Amino acid sequence: MTQYLDFEKPLAEIEGKAEELRALARANEEMDVAEEAAALDAKAAKLLDELYRDLTPWRKCQVARHPERPHCRDYVDALFTEYTPLAGDRNFADDLAVMGGLARFNDRPVMVIGHEKGSDTKSRIAHNFGMARPEGYRKAVRLIEMAGRFGLPVVTLVDTAGAYPGKGAEERGQSEAIARSTEMCLRAGVPLVSVIIGEGGSGGAVAFATANRVAMLEHSIYSVISPEGCASILWKNAEKMREAAEALRLTAQDLLKLGVVDRVIPEPRGGAHRDKTAAMEAVRGAIAAMLKELDGKSAEALIKDRRKKFLDIGSKGLAA
């Protein structure tokens, strides 16, 4: 059953009526509701286009967080073959908020790493809602180092509200672990490409997205802080999240103009959660294109390219 966001309530009513008609027809074979159902479907499609044509930043936040949106596990299953998971940071524990391992992408060996939020209550708790602890970032460092030894490109899939801010995480060196992961991304001598598939929250996202090429799905977000957190700090009122979302310029379209990301991946009508297969195939195309752009570059050129990319952030688009 589709979960509707608050701004999709009119759409829910129309699609609900269409489904009721079809249910009646299934119960009574003599009923012919094809024409009425088709009319409702057309009306719903038109409304869906109108709703998603010009989403506000806050509505994009809602879409990026949609519980039915495809997660890292879905992308790995759909886009990669021969996936062999690698666990643990060889220091403390295995953080299930971060998944990663060896795989093939379009028959090319790669290292894939990403945040996994989970898909139901039990798995979300197990994966800590995609909020990594220090051992998760240290696992990523280990896997990127391994990729460097074997000359494997690294693909990262970012989807996190941010690094976990718990007491234990802080005691085990959360900020240092994030910094080490970012440093490892900057000095890896192999191609590194990143896709923000949902939420890109603060340093927890940057630690995986310090890449040669960064792409964002059309309705994903990437920001130094959540709109709710920003509103609580600036206005002492989390209800100001809409204003905060506008000010943060966290949408893929804004960040492309600012030079923070390199490309925006179009999503199916109504968001990635409405057609997961199409969304994941669009991501496949973007990853393939980004890897192709980096083919043939030396380790020195890749490192120089990556460092320049991030040193240049803030040099354009701010006056717009």
Swiss-Prot record:
Catalytic activity: N(6)-carboxybiotinyl-L-lysyl-[protein] + acetyl-CoA = N(6)-biotinyl-L-lysyl-[protein] + malonyl-CoA
Recorded metabolic or biological pathway in which this protein acts: Lipid metabolism; malonyl-CoA biosynthesis; malonyl-CoA from acetyl-CoA: step 1/1
GO BP of this protein: fatty acid biosynthetic process; malonyl-CoA biosynthetic process
Transmembrane segments: none
GO molecular function: acetyl-CoA carboxylase activity; ATP binding; carboxyl- or carbamoyltransferase activity
The enzyme's E.C. designation: 2.1.3.15
Compartments, as annotated in UniProt: Cytoplasm
Source organism, top-level taxon: Bacteria
Alphabetical UniProt keywords: ATP-binding, Cytoplasm, Fatty acid biosynthesis, Fatty acid metabolism, Lipid biosynthesis, Lipid metabolism, Nucleotide-binding, Transferase
GO CC field: acetyl-CoA carboxylase complex
Domain CoA carboxyltransferase C-terminal: from-to ranges: 39-293
Annotated function: Component of the acetyl coenzyme A carboxylase (ACC) complex. First, biotin carboxylase catalyzes the carboxylation of biotin on its carrier protein (BCCP) and then the CO(2) group is transferred by the carboxyltransferase to acetyl-CoA to form malonyl-CoA.
Family note: Belongs to the AccA family.
Subunit note: Acetyl-CoA carboxylase is a heterohexamer composed of biotin carboxyl carrier protein (AccB), biotin carboxylase (AccC) and two subunits each of ACCase subunit alpha (AccA) and ACCase subunit beta (AccD).
Entry protein name: Acetyl-coenzyme A carboxylase carboxyl transferase subunit alpha
Upper taxonomic lineage: Bacteria, Pseudomonadati, Pseudomonadota, Alphaproteobacteria, Rhodobacterales
